[in-house]
Regions:
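Chitinase-like catalytic core of GlcNAc-active glycosidases
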Residues: 233-235
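Internal, well-ordered domain-core segments that constitute the primary functional module
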Residues: 228, 252-254
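C-terminal accessory extensions appended to soluble enzyme cores
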Residues: 405-536, 728-824
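Conserved AdoMet/S-adenosylmethionine-binding subsite of the radical SAM
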Residues: 238-241, 245, 261-417, 564-578, ...
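Iron-sulfur (Fe-S) cluster-binding segments and ferredoxin-like electron-carrier domains
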Residues: 219-231
Length: 824
């Protein structure tokens, strides 16, 4: 400690731990935070307005003045630390100013330094380690919990828990875990041999390691028996790899545990073994350590990250890809370290996708999910699933929400999130996942058992015969009249209007097939005519190259030659996160104009993504020369602070359009951290069958293209073609059913209806309303106030009526509905 430095004496109230912290180290941590991370996305708009402009020193000086501690950093820290040591697990304010969570983390790293993780054996150790009070009335029961469901914490999460009840809620044991409600496990009989499990025809699970550095209280493997299982060895891995070699239908392997990254030998044997299996396309590595134990990847000069990047390159040389799956649940879990890990992986061609359990009283209101997903997106992550409800395992009941609450969250996300980061709302049933209102729904309550409901799934008895015949012998399933399986699922429905009964038999309708000439004409029109919907509100001057379309609260589209007026419009509204750039030629032919445009957008902190529309990606992929790819890579800015992510949007109609050339191009772009996503228009008689879309989804997945939107109706081309060649809503559900059942979960698009008032999810954030013989689409995620916040003079266009709850009802030509069943 420097001679002119002073130290602060700290005593944690509940652990009794005493420590001295250098005042200079605290000040240095805050100055560094303000210098590097004190931005609006990371620290908040209000806090940044308080700290003002300048370097970290100046901004800290401004903060001291605003909190009443001008030129008195010691007083400031004494005040802040006096709150922190009480272990209240809450946000901290100093004289009315809330200190950002990430700044508190910077301070705590000085107060409670260290890495690694700790296994907790008793309540006294829990109190000493976390500095959080254990109630005497709960101590005996908590000890029983610890002995039943092991507790393990990282020092990283301990720091987070001290100032976030939402992080503590996930990892601290609680007496309600003794509630016997729920299952012992959710595994019920699909193929299981050693470390290998199989739930789907085309993918298997490798359980490489049974322990984790931190134990989530809601985990479906939380039981002590699961935590203490003997870890497999390299010979077990080789046996599992041989099973994959002997199973040509297996295309993807999910490597999980526990945390598989804790067993380096098994990880190496898995990757090296699967690399030699010709029919394997994707190796997916699952870990939560990015969120709760980032040191695993960053220690030893980021040795594990370097290893993964090398192995990813080797997999690419064998025509395969590596992906990393992780969980984030609340924005308080997001750290600069976790964002840095995601950026590093994605910038090196390794996709990172996020799965989020829906936890009651933690992330079940909407705004916290909007912030969480926005932070992760800028780093390059893809948002994959929200699981509703939390796994129905023993001791998890405090986390359970009703199904209707989970389904309704989709309305908030569709209204307030970029379309590129809206996860699929799904439920993991004991026989496989289903997506709400496309591949499944709640049918009815189970008679004489109020804790279970029947869920319609996309699976059939024949599906399991080749790999898991026991699945058809289960007593909690039934085959419905359409031939798919309904399964009893442990959950409360909540709002009983979400129980929809069985799907009615399909009425026979004539379907007109398109000629080959028609198909070529439609494909050509899709490439020539931009399918963007209209501006949902007045966005000012829309003349010539200065045209700007406000497509959503978060999204605008501009031309490559947009002027300063359009940039000013974007800058003036901090709800805008995404800018789509299109051109009368093609985005890659307009890079001269796009480069300075992106540089201007980089100075707008709330914009974190730019999307370039490129039809040439489809028809002329060789136009993406090395120079073009390098230029695009230079424009892509995946980073922790003020990111600006670059993505390519393209359109395909049929699977035979996708070639090996596209696959190679996607790989080159991915290795620059650039995602390619595709939209598809469902066209009557062209591709409106489950076989067509399943084939298209598979081809996209194989090429590495993300299948983003499958438009059921509403695009300009659909309004023209589908009037005479209508798409049947029944086909939409048949398509979703087959894609979910036969494909990878990573192949599934969002099923979308485009309207003049914005986009909605088929069935999930929209519904069919019958009005005097006409069918209208109810936009459940929007109302008049939504549009008035974007344009105070907005009024609904002529012909738009509203439902009793204020939701607009619109007509969408070309989509027919021949029954009154809510889903299809």
């Amino acid at each position: 400690m420097e001679s002119n430095d002073r130290s602060l004496n700290i005593v944690f109230k509940h652990s009794g731990k005493k420590t001295d912290v250098s005042l200079n180290s605290l000040k240095g941590a805050v100055v560094e935070f303000l210098d590097l991370y004190g931005t609006i996305p990371l620290a908040g708009k209000k806090f940044c307005s308080i700290t003002g402009e300048g370097d970290g020193e100046q901004r800290f000086s401004n903060l001291l003045k605003k909190t009443g501690y001008s030129s008195d950093p010691k007083g400031f820290f004494e005040d802040l630390l006096s709150i922190l040591v009480n272990g209240k697990m809450k946000k901290i304010t100093v004289n009315g100013i809330q200190i950002p969570h990430l700044m508190l983390m910077s301070i705590l790293e000085q107060v409670l330094p260290g890495h690694g993780y700790i296994s907790i054996k008793d309540t006294h150790q829990l109190e000493k380690t976390t500095h959080i009070k254990v109630s005497e009335k709960d101590r005996k029961q908590l000890q029983q919990v610890i002995e039943t469901y092991p507790v393990r914490l990282s020092r990283h999460t301990i720091r987070q828990m001290l100032v976030s009840k939402d992080v503590a809620y996930q990892y601290l044991p609680f007496v309600e875990e003794l509630d016997s409600g729920g299952h012992t496990n959710t595994w019920i009989g699909q193929f299981h041999d050693g470390l290998l499990e199989q739930m789907y025809q085309n993918r298997v699970i490798f359980l490489l390691n049974m322990a984790c550095p931190v134990y989530c209280r809601f985990c479906f493997r939380k039981h002590k028996d699961s935590r203490n299982e003997t870890n497999p060895c390299v010979e077990d891995v080789k046996k599992a790899v041989q099973h994959v070699k002997d199973s040509p239908g297996v295309k993807e392997i999910v490597v999980t545990g526990g945390d598989p990254f804790l067993n380096r030998a098994n990880m190496a044997a898995t990757i090296d073994g699967l690399m030699q299996v010709d029919h394997v396309q994707t190796v997916r590595l699952a870990t939560r350590s990015i969120a709760y134990y980032p040191d695993l990847f960053l220690e030893n000069e980021s040795a594990y990250l370097k290893y993964l990047k090398q192995k990813s390159f080797e997999l690419q040389q064998h025509g395969k890809r590596m992906e990393v799956a992780t969980h984030f649940i609340h924005p308080d879990e997001v750290s600069p370290e976790s964002l840095d890990i995601i950026c590093d992986l994605v910038n090196n061609g390794i996709a990172v996708y996020i799965q989020t359990p829906f936890l009651k009283d933690c992330n079940d209101k909407g705004p916290e999910l909007v912030r969480l997903f926005s932070l992760l997106r800028g780093a390059g992550a893809e948002l994959h699933y929200i699981y509703i409800p939390c796994s129905p395992i023993h001791g998890n009941s405090i986390y359970w929400s009703t199904l209707s609450e989970g389904i309704r969250i989709a309305n908030h996300l569709r209204a307030h999130l970029s379309d590129r980061i809206i996860p699929r709302i799904c439920t993991a049933t004991p026989i496989g996942k289903m997506d709400w209102y496309s591949s499944g729904w709640a049918v009815e309550k189970v008679k004489d058992n109020e804790n279970f409901i029947w869920i319609r799934t996309p699976y059939t008895p024949d599906y399991f015969k080749t790999f898991a015949p026991l699945a058809n012998e289960l007593t909690n399933i039934r085959v419905n009249d359409e031939g798919t399986i309904d399964i009893q699922y442990m959950a409360k429905i909540g709002d009983e209007s979400f129980l929809h009964g069985p799907r009615p038999e399909r009425e026979v309708t004539e379907k007109k097939s398109a000629s080959s000439d028609d198909i070529e004409m439609l494909k050509s029109e899709l490439l020539k005519e931009r399918q963007t919907g209209p501006s949902i509100v007045d966005a000012g001057d829309n003349s010539g190259f200065e045209k700007l379309l406000r497509l959503h609260e978060t999204r605008v589209e501009i031309d490559a030659r947009a002027k300063d007026a359009q940039i000013d419009y974007i800058r003036s509204d901090d709800k805008i996160t995404d800018v789509i750039i299109s051109s009368s030629t093609d985005a890659i032919d307009s890079l001269f104009y796009i480069k300075p445009l992106i540089k201007k957008l980089q100075d707008i902190p709330h914009v974190n993504a730019v999307r370039l529309f490129s039809s040439k990606f489809n028809v002329e992929p060789k136009a993406y020369t090395r120079a073009v790819i390098n230029t695009l890579g230079d424009l892509n800015k995946l980073c922790v602070v003020n990111p600006l992510r670059l993505e390519i949007e393209t359109w395909f109609t049929l699977a035979d359009e996708i070639t090996n050339t596209h696959e190679k191009l996607v790989r080159r772009l991915n290795n620059k951290g650039i995602t390619v996503y595709c939209n598809t228009a469902l066209l009557g008689g062209v591709n409106d069958s489950d076989a067509h879309i399943h084939s298209l989804a598979y081809s996209m997945r194989k090429a590495g293209i993300e299948f983003h939107h499958l438009y059921a109706a509403g695009l300009s081309i659909q309004q023209k073609w589908n009037r005479d060649h209508p798409v049947d809503s029944y086909d939409v559900v048949d398509i979703a059913t087959k894609v979910r059942r036969e494909g990878s979960g990573r192949e599934i698009p969002r099923y979308i209806i485009s309207t003049l008032l914005g986009e909605v999810d088929y069935g999930l954030t929209s519904s069919f309303v019958f009005d005097n013989g006409q069918v209208r689409i109810k936009l459940g995620c929007y109302d008049l106030s939504y549009y008035k916040k974007l344009d105070k003079n907005f009024e609904f266009p002529a012909g738009i009526i509203t439902d009793d709850d204020g939701s607009p009802l619109v007509q969408v030509p070309g989509l027919i509905k021949i029954n009154n069943f809510p889903v299809s």
